[in-house]
UniProtKB/Swiss-Prot annotation:
<dbReference type="GO" id="GO:0005829">
    <property type="term" value="C:cytosol"/>
</dbReference>
<dbReference type="GO" id="GO:0009231">
    <property type="term" value="P:riboflavin biosynthetic process"/>
</dbReference>
<feature type="modified residue" description="Phosphothreonine">
    <location>
        <position position="88"/>
    </location>
</feature>
<comment type="pathway">
    <text>Cofactor biosynthesis; riboflavin biosynthesis; riboflavin from 2-hydroxy-3-oxobutyl phosphate and 5-amino-6-(D-ribitylamino)uracil: step 1/2.</text>
</comment>
<dbReference type="GO" id="GO:0000906">
    <property type="term" value="F:6,7-dimethyl-8-ribityllumazine synthase activity"/>
</dbReference>
<keyword id="KW-0597">Phosphoprotein</keyword>
<feature type="binding site">
    <location>
        <begin position="87"/>
        <end position="88"/>
    </location>
    <ligand>
        <name>(2S)-2-hydroxy-3-oxobutyl phosphate</name>
    </ligand>
</feature>
<keyword id="KW-0686">Riboflavin biosynthesis</keyword>
<dbReference type="InterPro" id="IPR034964">
    <property type="entry name" value="LS"/>
</dbReference>
<feature type="binding site">
    <location>
        <position position="115"/>
    </location>
    <ligand>
        <name>5-amino-6-(D-ribitylamino)uracil</name>
    </ligand>
</feature>
<feature type="binding site">
    <location>
        <position position="24"/>
    </location>
    <ligand>
        <name>5-amino-6-(D-ribitylamino)uracil</name>
    </ligand>
</feature>
<dbReference type="Pfam" id="PF00885">
    <property type="entry name" value="DMRL_synthase"/>
</dbReference>
<dbReference type="GO" id="GO:0009349">
    <property type="term" value="C:riboflavin synthase complex"/>
</dbReference>
<dbReference type="InterPro" id="IPR002180">
    <property type="entry name" value="LS/RS"/>
</dbReference>
<keyword id="KW-0808">Transferase</keyword>
<keyword id="KW-0964">Secreted</keyword>
<comment type="subunit">
    <text>Forms an icosahedral capsid composed of 60 subunits, arranged as a dodecamer of pentamers.</text>
</comment>
Length: 158
């Protein structure tokens, strides 16, 4: 018996990609943006097919993402931001609502929403995940978006 496997590839199909980016903690977020754009371009996406949309912070990213999905015109949305834990419960509220909101948008509109919003305990962890020891989570989110666009195209073709 041969099992059939369907999985996405990182070869960019024709498509447009939106990066919805929270400006708060920009010293980290800009590295995520650079990583995401670099990963998309290295995998065949033209810069003219990438649009960066800036929101004030991570809490606002889901609403902006919803509007982008609602308007159409993009094959995937890549959410990028950074929420760094402080001394109050604010971190839990922002991180949780951002995560839930992005998942809802993806399911509601049937569009891949790649999650590149860092939720970390310290500035050091944020820096590590934006291009040093732990790689670049922006680039990883971009690869996730490419793979999901490919996978959904295959599923829709069946």
């Amino acid at each position: 018996m041969t099992l059939k496997t369907i999985e996405g590839t990182f070869i960019a199909p024709k498509g447009r990609y939106a990066l919805v980016v929270g400006r708060f903690n920009s010293f980290v977020v800009e590295s995520l943006v650079s990583g995401a754009v670099d990963a998309l371009v290295r995998h065949g996406v033209a810069e003219s097919e990438i649009t960066i949309i800036r929101a004030p912070g991570a809490f606002e990213i889901p609403l902006v993402t919803q509007k982008v999905a609602q308007q159409g015109g993009f094959d995937a949305i890549i959410a990028l931001g950074a929420v760094i834990r402080g001394g109050t419960p604010h971190f839990e509220y922002v991180a949780g609502e951002c995560t839930k909101g992005l998942a809802q948008v993806s399911l509601q509109f049937g569009i891949p929403v790649a999650f590149g919003v860092l939720t970390v305990d310290s500035i050091e962890q944020a820096i590590e995940r934006s291009g040093t020891k732990a790689g670049n989570k922006g680039a990883e989110a971009a690869l996730s978006a490419l793979e999901m666009v490919s996978l959904l195209a295959q599923l829709e073709a069946k």
